[in-house]
Amino acid sequence: MFASKVYFSLTEILDAAHHRTHNEWHQLDHRPENLLLPGVAWGDRWVRSPDCAQASAGLAPEYARTHYAIMYWFREPLRATLDEFFKLSEFSFQWGRSPQIGWTKRPLRGFFSPVKGYVATRVRVSADALPRRPVKGIHVTVSRLRRHDALTQEAFRWYDEVRLPDLLHCRGAAGAWTFASDDLFAPPWDDSMPAWSFADSGSRSAEAFPLRMTIMYLDEDPLEYLADVAERDVAWKAGGRVHDTSTVEEVFFSSPFRMIVPWEWNWFDTAKAAS
């Protein structure tokens, strides 16, 4: 695996007048500096345009106003990598190059461990190369796990053996990666982290609410991908290939995003004019 950890964030812009400034800063300043760090394997950013927002689902109202998603992949040694990553963030502030402070809100941000990568048979690259491969968009699903038992394991098996392979046949699907939040991987001897390790067989309902995330990488318009999934689901349901996983997970956020093309940042101009 080319990276042992990822940082993922959902971002809301509180003032529509700042979308262009925010994109200029992140795409032309912040991201290039981050990618220069030796421990940063890759980093990308996507926009949840108004039409993507209309095609979204999920139970968490705090994510409903999300405009952007950000992800960085980190190499080992992780401690040194993150030290440099956060040091650059502070230096950027000291240089006067953090204009996003004051108009951004991040309803979701945190570290995840990559679980497994999948690649469509038509795509020639490896799963490790998939995040670096150009796409037209992605689809992100974030779920909160309700439990950590045999039923959950069976749901994960269904995702791995049935659901994700099926989705890779949908229009534009190039591949996928699954992720699990850090609290699922705390060693049982580490009291500083929530007790959600496999060694803790008796009390997985602690206060922690671990997250599971899936990202689909798309070569076609993300809305066309979703339309194809909906059409194929009719036959898949009739054939018993679609399972109800609501007993083991709550889908907090499920949304398509578009790739951000440099200098083409006009998705929210109507909202800006109205404000």
What is each residue range found by the language model?
Residues 1-275:
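Macromolecular interaction modules
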